[in-house]
Every structure is written in C-alpha cells, then in structure tokens.
Amino acid sequence: NEVKFRGITQINRLILFGGEPFLNTQLFEYIIKEFSKFTTILKIETVTNGTVLNNNVKKIIDNFQPYLTISLDGPEFIHYKLRGKGSHRKTTKFIHYLKTINYTNFEIASTYTRLHQLHSLSRDDIFQYFTNMDVHFNINDVFSKNKVLVVKEMEKSLVDRKKFITDSINNIVENNEKAFISPILYDVLISMIYKSTNHTFCDDIDPSNTITFDVDGSKKLCFRFWGTHNSSKAELFNNKEYFQQCKDCWCKGMCLECVANIIDGYSSVINEDGQFIECHKPELMEYCIKEIIYLSQDQSKISKLVNNFKRFIRYA
C-alpha cells in the first residue's frame, strides 16, 4: 500500500532478505506477485545461505530468475565453524544445482574473519578456493566487535591495494569476469564510464531512491537497521559536506562509504562519533586514473576495459 500510494510504477531492484528467505517461499512469491499487479519489476534479488533446496525453491528460481547472493565462507571446515555442521555440504549442493541448470544469475559472498587467520587461511587462499570453484564471488572482512571474529590488521597495505587495482584492471581487460575486482577501481570506473556522481556516501538510504521495510512492515533506512537498531545520525553522516576533509576532496563525487558501518564503528575512515580518522581513497583513486591513462595508450586494451566492465557490475 505504501508503494502504491507513492505512485511508484517501476521497481528497479526488489531485494528480499531473511533470515533465510527460502524458508518461506509462499511469502517470497506473494510479495513479487502483489507488487507485479501495479509495478514493473526490473530485477529481483535475494541473499541466501543456500541451505534450502526443494521443489518450491526450484520453482521460485525458474519462475522469477532472481539474482542470488549465496553466503559461503570458504572450505568445509571453516564454513562449519562459522555457520554450523552440515551447512557447507548443503550450500555447495545448492551451487552445484545452479550450475547443472546453467543458471548464471548468482554470486558467492564470503566473509573473511579472524578464524580464517587462526587456521592459516589467507585472503589469497579463499580467493583461490572460489576461483577453483569457477563462480562469481566477493570477499569482505567481517563487521564485528567480537574479538574472536574480527580480522587482525584488516586493512591491506597501500602497496597491496595498488597491486590489487592493477590486477583488477588486467582481469577486466582479459574479461576474467568471475574475478573479484578492487572496490576502489569499481567506484572509479562506475563514475568514469557511466558519468555518475555520488552526492552522498550511500544512495541506498536516500528515501527518494529506496524504501526499506522490516519484517513487521515498518520503514527503515536500510536492512542494516532492521529490528530495534536505528540511528538519528544516519542523515547527518550521509552528508559529505558535514566532513571538512570530504567537502574539499577532489574525488568526493566517486566516493562511497557505508553509513551503517560508520554508525556501528566499523569504518576505517570515520568513527562512530563522526570524527574523521584517515582516508587513502584520494591516493588510490589517483592511482586508478593514472593506470587507466597509461592503459589508454593501447586503444584495444582501453576499449576492452570500458566494454568488458559491465560484466563486472555486481550486487553490492
């Protein structure tokens, strides 16, 4: 009723979360059909653990072709420690099913934690694990204040991050579309190729772009604020003009930063009190641009970078 009242006739992305959304396929289907009565839905997305695979789930996949983000944290033993015994087998079975029906509309989301480090699993090990699986994937450090989970020395060195950018450019040029590319390069290319400008840190919490509903029907800023978790600081912290360093920054139009991470104290750029810490994005974005300029000396390679990039645009 809220969406209908606002006169919305097109939904660019309908994103359905859980818990585990596929535990209630009837509700999943009901929401889509109700919205379809008065809107055009361009894309349906969901985040799943991939632990439920029955005829109802298969029907959902077949009928609605949702973009699936599947949670898998690495090899069997580490995934079991994080998500429970038996979960890895179910999730890999789910992925195998998608491959057997040639369903390519999915990616793996992996969370890198301190437990990975304690069991001698580096990010490169996890990267190689998913590369060997031949799937689209992304790897993110855990957001947690639990010292058992939080990654020691979470930030890569600037040298490593620059190498990651160079490797990412090569992967795009070579069309290795299942490779995970640098988020910094991603933001730069989105801005340069599609001529977009990010006026705020996060468009997802802008009510003119996005409406988020909790399970009880109440409106929230984004899914990170479901339940009782909310903050009056969100609108303030989403304003780049509020921070002097950001206000005067040459690359602020390309910059994205998760406001929920800032509020929850997980951002390495701005703390939960709104105090600026440090930011290496200007240096890294400048490096991206220099690498792109260098690449432009080869017309074939720069054309491949621009034309292939659309295949690397992911759920975020």
For the regions a language model picked out, list residue spans one by one:
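Exposed loop/turn and edge beta-strand positions of beta-sandwich/beta-sheet ligand-binding modules
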Residues: 10-12, 207, 245
